[in-house]
Amino acid sequence: VYDNCWDFVGEGVHALFMDIDSEVVGKNFLYMLTEDKYAAMLKDAFNALPADEQAYFQPTIDEMESEASDLGLGADGKYALAWIKLWVGSYNAQTDDGPICNTLVTDSATDQCGLLVYNKFRSVEESAGVSVNNVKVAAYQDGYQGIGGYGYCHYLFVTDNSPLPWTACAFIAYMTCTEDGYSA
């Protein structure tokens, strides 16, 4: 059961993840965790763990304290760096989010986990052994502690040489502000 974000970096866990050198988005996620807001979430999630699980992670957290200070991170930066170190040292590198999704939706993928773009589940073709219902999004479960994903802001621009700027603005509004446009 993954009810805390530290479970994903626990002993023997090898989450499926698109290798950090495949696309910058994976690195951005890890960098983002060092922001005070997310580092505090990691600390709070750590504090919610049972004592035996805390004891497993504590040496890595302690090891990262001087590194966090050297990098000028906030008071909880050592929790972020520890989580990142454990994640990078344990994930099962994949080439893309598509194969990760295809693995996790099979009924044989019990006790596997991964971090991937959520919209990959939209393209799953349901069958006897394949279903999005085989996946539980940890962050959506009652009682989950810690980080649970992230999203990027959409930046859609209209250039100053656009022949139809109001049409472009209307299209952007449709894509970002309506259910039909967003799901397209």
Regions found by a protein language model. Give the residues of each.
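A conserved helix-loop-strand patch within extracytoplasmic ligand-binding domains
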Residues: 1-17
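Ligand-binding pocket segment of bilobal, Venus flytrap-like solute-binding proteins
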Residues: 17, 22-137
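Extracytoplasmic/periplasmic substrate-recognition and gating elements
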Residues: 99, 110-112, 128-183
